Amino acid sequence: MRAVRRLSIAALVVACLHLVFGAIVRISGSGMGCGDNWPKCYGYWFPPFSRMDLVVEVSHRYLASILVIAVASMVLVAFRHRAEPGVGGRGGALRSSLGALGAVLLAAVLGGVTVKLGNAPWATVAHWLVAMTVLAMIATTTIRSGTLGGTAALVQRGSSRAARAAYVAAALAILAVALGGLTAKFPGAAVGCTTVPLCGPNPSVVPSSIHIQITHRTLAVLLALHLVGVVMMLRKRRSTEAPIVLRAAWIALAMVILQLGVASAMILLHMRPVYRSLHEATGIGIWLSCFALAYLASRVARASETAVAATVAARGGPVPVQRAATTPVTDS
């Protein structure tokens, strides 16, 4: 299990770096740095580094190759240790690592399709969402291997109410991240609003671009307000809720607050477009923290249901039927 844990952490770090670099590719307009050539760049695996957009795009592809190797290694090690508790079988690290490998291969193929389509906004957003899926599956493997609070979630107790609230946070987070990717790629959307917190429309861009940024902002605010409510609920019910879930909620809320600060500074200080990569990096942190919150809350709720059922069965009473809401969506 220790080897799986180490490789999952390494894969998670590489995935985060790859996603941040992908944001730099989009923001710098380097997505077509190799033209419509894929997987090679103008017929070369190692082309002459004569242009900056080519360097950025090729570096992004190299990072993708490293990520594939890291995830494949994680799968192989998990398969070798599949007999250990928590690795093989339902809810084990092996299944989630296989999901991560499938997602990363799909992301690689979709990246090639995106290049062939000339980096169309819809294809870029689809690629971005698949990349978020890769991150989620690697995070699932990391948690199942005992890191990021995975071990504590099996021994602490919590409610399905907290799990449902965490699911909503994760859903809002992925929607906000998707709209963030569209805002960065759609012509004029990134500069559609010139003021904060309200949107002072930029007269030089089309209304659709402004609407995209307004929707992105609205989702971000809804996520922040929801996480405030989640933290308040968990603090009020701290005697019956898992500390690891409260800690994860605090981290997610802190990431959202940081993101709102970064976004406001970008607009008010008229920061250069390259600094939008920091905004995207924080967005990745938001998705990772919200997904971890949802998965940990689900894991805690399921462990609590199992413990209650075992206690009732030991006393000879009827075993309560588990509710569907407490079943983790990522366990397979």
Region locations from a protein language model:
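Polytopic transmembrane helical bundles with strong interfacial aromatic enrichment
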Residues: 1-332
